[in-house]
Regions:
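Conserved "right-hand" nucleotidyltransferase catalytic core of DNA-directed polymerases
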Residues: 2-4, 8, 112-115, 123-380, ...
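Short, glycine-/Ser/Thr-/acidic-enriched flexible segments
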Residues: 9-10, 27-29, 63-64, 271, ...
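Active-site-proximal helix-loop-helix substrate-binding element of RNase H-like nuclease domains
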Residues: 13, 17-20, 24-44, 55-150, ...
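Short active-site loop/helix that positions an aromatic residue
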Residues: 22, 63-75, 90, 271-280, ...
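Short His-Asn-centered micro-motif
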Residues: 59-61, 268, 400
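Short acidic alpha-helix initiation/capping motifs at coil-to-helix transition points
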Residues: 61, 167-168, 266, 427, ...
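Conserved catalytic core of nucleic-acid polymerases
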Residues: 174, 199, 228, 232, ...
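Function-dense linear segments that define catalytic or interfacial modules
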Residues: 354-467
Length: 584
């Protein structure tokens, strides 16, 4: 038996102190409705009696809101079996932009009543809204189970294995929300001030190097050149003075003259691009955009990732001031992170790590401010991450990671088709990036050995000469390009994309791309022999990929994503499984 329920309260968790009502619909094992009701202004005994029912409770975001709120308000302690239709919505409908009951209600033709006042309306108004939410969610739950039966061929055990897995992930999200991190506000404000100052310095350096921004206007020959007495008019005198200044003859009818001259603006993409083109810029990074006519145009991009595009970095030797543009990109991003930290912090200076959904591999999509934070190795990354501190002396901030997780899961799949290469990768000291660099000709064997020798010295904190350090940095750039193809290749990156990312020529990027796939042909074989199917549900086709480790089906947008989806899904499942073992 299932009980689809919802509640209405006078606010969110941490604010609400009253539950207006609980509404529900009971379903039998065949999902037939066998009863419904509402509990206005429930007291503690009624709430506990409701949750003592022999049923599986179904709700939308109940793991992170409804049930925790019930525990807060009524002291509910018993554990209950649940199905959260929000988590299932994230899983089943990857193309939906929004997953709230309001959006699903539109699909089902059941409008969600709008209420903005959660304190002073009648109980009946809150009950009505709650009842309509239950109607929407009942339809959604029935649809979701029907869809899951198609995907999992009616295997109920596997369906509920998936549901329990999603439940655990949502419970992890709840734990994050229940344990907010504190922002070191004083240090954040200090860092923000320093970065703002650095931003001004970089902008000033760019302004000093950029061409001035000049605008022009057209001056036409005066219509009236002479007065009635035959003398030149004032306009005519000014015109003739202009012709003399410009070295033009009397036959001239119009002259283009300078209207204004201002310092260049680093914030103007048009001015920056004009400057770059004057320096010989050949763009390699583009963004497809539609114009008003619906035609798609590839627009050259100044930035790619954390900094400027590789094609602009090629111009650093010609115009060193462009390094300020690269740095300015990083500074602006870090300023944005700091401002978000400060704006999202509550009155205690704390922020929550919240989630916005699942990726197709069931990883979390994270909400700001704790999302896509720079690595400690990147510019201001250590300082930014250091701003997240424990809320008090009774807590400690800790984290966990698994070394080479995705590389290990990748080797698991590759082993079935190329055990020899996997055995090589498992040898201590093997560097897959150096391997690709050698095979592609990015590095010679002697350079590879020299890189390893100097790296060992640096790892052991032994002294190196200035010459060795210069050599290491040069070789490390070559290794970085090989590393790019190792990571990007597995996600289906084309030679053009590699050229754009690395700054290498397209012919060499093609060679690098071919080298990668010659070495990693087993990746294609894994993808080729993967288990896929396409479902038709509600008039929409959806590709699905089966993961033999997790035994889940993952939504798939493009066939080029088969291996990366398989690999990332396995890594996520392995990480969660080990977390469960630690907890148990």
């Amino acid at each position: 038996m299932f009980t689809v329920f919802d509640l209405e309260s006078n606010g969110l968790r941490g604010v609400a102190d009253k539950c207006w009502c609980i509404c529900y619909t009971d379903l039998n094992s065949d999902l037939e409705e066998i009863g419904s009701g509402s509990i206005p202004l429930p007291d503690t005994e009624k709430v506990k009696e409701f949750f003592r029912k022999e049923t599986t409770f179904v709700g939308h975001n109940i793991i992170r809101f409804d049930i925790p709120l019930i525990r807060d308000l009524y002291g509910l302690t018993q554990e209950v079996e649940v199905v959260d239709t929000l988590g299932l919505s994230w899983y089943l409908y990857p193309n939906l932009l929004k997953h709230g009951l309001e959006e699903h209600g539109v699909r089902f033709g059941i409008p969600k009543p709008v209420i903005k006042d959660w304190d002073s309306l009648t109980v009946e108004e809150y009950v009505y809204r709650c009842e309509e939410d239950v109607k929407i969610n009942t339809q959604l739950f029935k649809e979701q189970l029907a869809y899951l039966k198609i995907i999992y061929s009616g295997d109920t055990e596997r369906i509920f294995n998936l549901i329990n897995y999603l439940n655990f992930k949502l419970d992890c999200a709840l734990e994050q929300e229940n344990n907010p991190l504190k922002i070191d506000v004083e240090s954040a404000e200090d860092s923000l001030e320093k970065l703002e100052q650095l931003k001004f310095e970089k902008e000033d350096a760019l302004i000093a190097s950029m061409p001035a921004h000049v605008t022009f206007r057209t001056v036409n020959k005066p219509a009236k050149m002479f007065t009635v007495k035959g003398d030149l008019t004032k306009a005519a005198l000014a015109w003739e003075s202009l012709l003399v200044a410009e070295g033009l003859g009397p036959e001239t009818e119009s002259v283009v003259v300078e209207k204004s001259r201002e310092p260049g603006k680093p914030t103007s993409s048009t001015q920056i691009k004009n400057w770059l083109y004057a320096l010989g810029w050949e763009p390699c990074t583009f963004e497809a955009r539609k114009n008003k006519q619906g035609d798609i145009k590839n627009v050259p991009q100044i930035y790619a990732g954390d900094g400027v595009a590789p094609s602009i970095k090629k111009l650093f030797d010609i115009e060193p001031a462009l390094e300020n543009l690269d740095m300015l990109s990083l500074i602006n991003h870090r300023i944005g992170v700091l401002k978000t930290f400060l704006s999202k912090a509550d009155d205690k200076g704390c922020v929550q790590a919240t989630v916005a959904g699942f990726t197709n591999t069931l990883r979390f999509r994270h909400n700001k401010p704790i999302a896509n934070l720079p690595s400690p190795k990147k510019f201001y990354g250590k300082e930014i991450r250091g701003l997240l501190i424990a809320p008090d002396d009774e807590h400690v901030v800790c984290g966990s990671d698994m070394s080479a997780l995705e590389d290990t899961t990748k080797q698991h799949y590759m082993y079935f088709y190329d055990p020899e290469y996997v055995e090589q990768m498992r040898v201590p000291g093997f560097d897959p990036h150096i391997d690709i660099a050698l095979l592609s000709g990015l590095m010679t064997k002697e350079e590879a050995e020299e890189f390893k020798r100097i790296k060992k010295l640096l790892d052991n904190k032994e002294p190196v000469t200035d010459e060795e350090l210069i050599t290491f940095k040069s070789l490390d750039k070559k290794r970085a390009n090989a590393k790019t193809v190792n990571f990007a290749g597995i996600y289906g990156a084309s030679p053009a994309k590699l050229a754009e990312t690395t700054g290498l020529t397209l012919p060499f990027a093609k060679k690098l791309h071919q080298t990668y796939w010659n070495r990693n042909q087993s990746v294609k074989l894994v993808a080729k022999h993967s288990i896929r199917k396409t479902t038709m549900f509600n008039g929409e086709e959806q590709m699905w990929l089966y993961n033999p480790v997790s035994k889940f089906w993952y939504s798939l947008r493009y066939e080029k994503d088969i291996f990366s989806t398989l690999n990332q899904g396995t890594g996520d499942n392995y990480l969660i499984t080990n977390q469960l073992r630690l907890i148990i």
